[in-house]
Structure formats: C-alpha cells, structure tokens
Regions:
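Conserved anion-binding
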Residues: 72-166
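Acidic-and-aromatic substrate-binding clefts and catalytic sites of carbohydrate-active enzymes
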Residues: 43-49, 74-76, 166-169
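Residue-level marker for well-ordered alpha-helical positions
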Residues: 21-25, 52, 78, 145, ...
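Acidic (Asp/Glu)-rich catalytic clusters
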Residues: 25-34, 49-64, 79-88, 103-112, ...
Length: 202
C-alpha cells in the first residue's frame, strides 16, 4: 500500500478526524482521496486494540491513516511510535521529541511524520518543548529555521503548528509558512480551523 498521502496538485492534503470507519470512508471519497483520516491513539486502552481497529481504517481508505496523539497529548508519544511501526500508515502525528523514535521504528522514509511546535507570541520563534517531560519544563524557544533543521535531523517531514486557535497567531503562522517554503519543508497548521478561516490559512 502507498505510504505517502495523496496530495492535490502535489501541494495540499487535508487531515481530518474520523469518528468511525464509515465516516472515514465517506470523508475519503468526498475529498477524492486527497485526505488522511485521523484516528487517535488516546481512544484505545491497549496497543493491540488500537492496531486491530486502525487496520479497518487502512482497508477502508487505502492506507490514508493518520495515527494521532489526542489533542497533542505528549503522553501518547510512545504509543504512537509503537503503533506506527506495525501499521506503516501514510501519516504520523508526533510531539517534537517523538519524531526520531517514530522514524527509526517505521524503518522507511515515505510516511509523513510531523513534529509539534507551539506558538510563542513572538513572530519567527516557536516552542519545541512539547514532549512528555519537556512540556512541563520552561519553554524551549528557538527560531523556526532551527526547529525545521532539528526536525530534518530526526527524520521529520513537517511542522505541526499547534495550537493556532484559528487566526489568533496569524502573523506567527505566516513566518512559519515562509520558513517552511524557504527550507523545503511541509507545514501542518492545526487548531481552530473552520470553514470561515480555512481559505485564509491555506
């Protein structure tokens, strides 16, 4: 099965949460395949239960599965890495510090892995302390260009800029988008995106 998302014009792919296999299939068909369907690891008590259920999504959507944390929960990082090793999905959501483990366990470079960084209130700077322990420590604020380079070092594919809260951090988002373009890196704006602000964000 294909391990990379099906981008529209090689540029854009939606990532939406699916609440059932049937819903995932409907979303996949509505988006003409230009979508990955998020299923949250946090919703499962065990790896085995998650793997069994997520395999159903893989079959229904031709592997357009996005293994999710659950509202960016850093405590799900290790579980996401373990699930991804078995499932080999098209897309993996990770906190910044979980990217390297996920890439190593996947054993291939096709799956897209994002690394979660947060807005700081300062244009051009992001917080990469989003892991299980680091998220409880003082912020790790670095230039967006440095965050991108670190993610590349770890085998990451994209920046997950979360939580955007819609257009609240628009100027910061523009700087992140510019840096991603200049450094040939994917960008995943996340948080508070709706039909009203979708076009402006894209």
């Amino acid at each position: 099965m294909k391990k990379t998302p099906n981008y529209l014009e090689d540029r854009l792919c939606l990532n939406v949460l699916a609440n059932s296999v049937e819903n995932a299939k409907a979303c996949y068909e509505a988006a003409q395949g230009h979508v990955v369907l998020g299923v949250l690891s946090k919703n499962y008590a065990t790896d085995e239960a998650a793997i069994e259920d997520m395999k159903r999504y893989i079959v229904a959507t031709d592997n357009a599965l996005s293994v999710g944390l659950g509202a960016g929960d850093p405590n799900q990082s290790a579980m996401v890495a373990r699930l991804s090793e078995v499932l080999q999905p098209q897309h993996v959501n990770q906190v910044f510090t979980g990217v390297g483990a996920s890439r190593a366990l996947l054993g291939q470079n096709d799956t897209i892995i994002n690394g979660l960084v947060s807005p700081t209130g300062t244009v051009g700077m992001v917080n990469l302390a989003t892991g299980p322990l680091s998220s409880q420590a003082p912020a790790g604020i670095v230039p967006i260009e440095t965050a991108i380079a670190l993610l590349k070092d770890m085998g990451g594919s994209s920046i997950k800029f979360f939580n955007m809260k819609g257009l609240t951090h628009l100027e910061e988002y523009k700087a992140v988008a510019t840096a991603c373009a200049e450094n040939d890196f994917y960008l995943e704006p996340t948080g508070g995106i709706d039909l009203e602000n979708f076009q402006e964000i894209v």
